[in-house]
Amino acid sequence: MYMVTTTWRHDKPIDKVNMRKILSGLKDRNNSNEVIDVMWFEIDEVTHGSVLIYSSKEACEKDMKARNTNRKDSGLKMLREETGETFAVMSEL
């Protein structure tokens, strides 16, 4: 598996209902076995974190164009991003 974690800053307090709708709309794009899951979580009222789980680095790279388009369209400021191959997964041990 391959992970992407990001932190995002909003100009206003997070609209969680709208964000759930946005994520639901992305399900059609992410309906393959290559995107395992996407999770968004609140850090504070104007900052959220994101975890994307891909089946492989290649799957992540394949999704990059669509992901970057969504990022640009969001109007949010990305504070950080980390990516990497998993090497230990508790549910697999």
Annotate each predicted stretch with a short phrase.
Residues 68-72:
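Low-complexity, intrinsically disordered Gly/Pro/Thr-rich segments
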Residues 1-49, 55-66, 76-93:
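Short S/T/G/P-rich N-terminal loop/turn motif that feeds into the first structured element of a domain
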